């Protein structure tokens, strides 16, 4: 058992010694990166460690070429209302862009979230030129609104000024009131303006008030009617007494 256990340890030590001798004997200038990596792989295979690749050989996250992206953007803009290419269309785009089907599918998945909403808001025919975003778009929007407000509000104000005398004149004609002359006293103007206000107040109070109470005259009429009934009853009793007296002399 001890001899079997010492066997692998001796072989590992021999391999490490041989590799060290080979590295020392070979000149450093003549060694290529491939030879270095092969030696590292051999040493790590013997020791059971995973090799670490050099930094210049690490795979970087690649991006699609600009020409391929332009072709895909053009296709998406033309079909922006149905940006779901079929399998045949994906194969056609892969031939034009020299990209794989998986790359095209991934590009469309990301583009539908990031690029398509901006494309749907455009009105032109250029899929590359985008709208202004951020502070520039907000500033242009404010300028456009400020410029459009006076243009819209100007004629409306003049129409309101011209329509005021037309609306106020029929009231005086229908009510029969005379329009005061420009040289009249200001007190007359105030009284004429105050009269409709008083009427409006009275009408509001009467409309919001409770039902009209019964006047006191109705109670007086009822009491007099009761008195008349009592007097008639007494008169009838007196007449009966008189008849009885006449019948019994």
From Swiss-Prot:
InterPro entries with a match to the protein in the record: HD (IPR001356), Homeodomain-like_sf (IPR009057), KN_HD (IPR008422), TALE_homeobox (IPR050224)
Name of this chain's protein: Homeobox protein TGIF2LX
Presence of keyword tRNA processing: no
Keyword entries, A-Z: DNA-binding, Homeobox, Nucleus, Transcription, Transcription regulation
Location of the region described as Disordered in the Swiss-Prot/TrEMBL record: 1-65, 126-199
Polar residues biased stretches: 28-46, 159-172
Basic and acidic residues bias: start-end ranges: 9-27
Organism: Macaca mulatta (Rhesus macaque)
Gene Ontology cellular component annotations, sorted alphabetically: nucleus
Molecular function per GO: DNA binding; DNA-binding transcription repressor activity, RNA polymerase II-specific
GO biological process per UniProt: negative regulation of transcription by RNA polymerase II
Domain of life: Eukaryota
Family recorded in the similarity comment: Belongs to the TALE/TGIF homeobox family.
Subcellular compartments: Nucleus
DNA-binding region(s) from the entry: 55-118
Keyword Nucleus: yes
General function of this protein: May have a transcription role in testis.
Pfam family, one: Homeobox_KN
């Amino acid at each position: 058992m001890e001899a079997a256990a010492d066997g692998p340890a001796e072989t590992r030590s021999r391999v490490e010694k041989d590799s060290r001798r080979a590295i020392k004997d070979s000149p450093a200038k003549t060694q290529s990166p491939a030879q270095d990596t092969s030696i590292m792989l051999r040493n790590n295979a013997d020791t059971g460690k995973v090799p670490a690749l050099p930094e210049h050989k690490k795979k970087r996250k690649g991006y699609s070429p600009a020409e391929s992206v332009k072709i895909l953007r053009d296709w998406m803009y033309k079909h922006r209302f149905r940006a779901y290419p079929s399998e045949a269309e994906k194969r056609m785009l892969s031939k034009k862009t020299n990209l794989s089907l998986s790359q095209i599918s991934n590009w469309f998945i990301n583009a539908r979230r990031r690029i398509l909403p901006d494309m749907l808001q455009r009105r032109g025919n250029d899929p590359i030129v985008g709208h202004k975003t951020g502070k520039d778009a907000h500033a242009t929007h404010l300028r456009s609104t400020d410029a459009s407000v006076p243009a819209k509000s100007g004629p409306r104000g003049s129409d309101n000024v011209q329509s005021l005398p037309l609306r106020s004149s029929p009231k005086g004609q229908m009510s029969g009131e005379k329009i005061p002359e420009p040289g009249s006293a200001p007190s007359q103007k105030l009284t004429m303006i105050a009269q409709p206000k008083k009427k409006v107040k009275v009408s509001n109070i009467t409309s919001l008030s409770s039902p009209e109470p019964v006047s006191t005259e109705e109670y007086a009429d009822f009491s007099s009617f009761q008195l008349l009934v009592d007097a008639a009853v007494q008169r009838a009793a007196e007449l009966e007494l008189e008849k009885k007296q006449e019948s019994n002399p």
